Amino acid sequence: MALSVEEKAQIVAEYQQTAGDTGSPEVQVALLTANINKLQGHLKPTTKTTTPVRGLIRMVNHRRKLLDYLKGKDTTRYSALIGRLGLRR
């Protein structure tokens, strides 16, 4: 359940710091959040599959690490990103 090219481009355009920015923590966290939300919707009716759940846990942990990094580097960018994405932290 990966994101389409158009969805990725829209997310990158919305969260990038400068033109062509695809590697900033904000962009990476936004892409991971979209992937996590899409995978959660897929996993609701199918409760017996363990491999996608494992992938979901890996994505959540990776997003948490990126958010911890951003929180240590710049707390204002961190709090702005949390507010824009609607994450609980």
Curated annotation (Swiss-Prot):
SUPFAM superfamilies with a match to the protein in the record: S15/NS1 RNA-binding domain (SSF47060)
One Pfam family per UniProt: Ribosomal_S15
Gene3D superfamilies, per database record: 6.10.250.3130, S15/NS1, RNA-binding
Cross-referenced InterPro entries: Ribosomal_uS15 (IPR000589), Ribosomal_uS15_bac-type (IPR005290), uS15_NS1_RNA-bd_sf (IPR009068)
Keywords, sorted A to Z: Ribonucleoprotein, Ribosomal protein, RNA-binding, rRNA-binding
Ribonucleoprotein found in the keyword field: yes
MF annotations from Gene Ontology: rRNA binding; structural constituent of ribosome
Statement: the UniProt record of this protein carries the keyword Metal-binding: no
GO CC terms in record: cytosolic small ribosomal subunit
GO biological process: translation
Domain of life: Bacteria
Family: Belongs to the universal ribosomal protein uS15 family.
Function comment: One of the primary rRNA binding proteins, it binds directly to 16S rRNA where it helps nucleate assembly of the platform of the 30S subunit by binding and bridging several RNA helices of the 16S rRNA. Forms an intersubunit bridge (bridge B4) with the 23S rRNA of the 50S subunit in the ribosome.
Summary of subunit composition and partner proteins: Part of the 30S ribosomal subunit. Forms a bridge to the 50S subunit in the 70S ribosome, contacting the 23S rRNA.
The protein's name: Small ribosomal subunit protein uS15
Organism per entry: Pseudomonas putida (Arthrobacter siderocapsulatus)
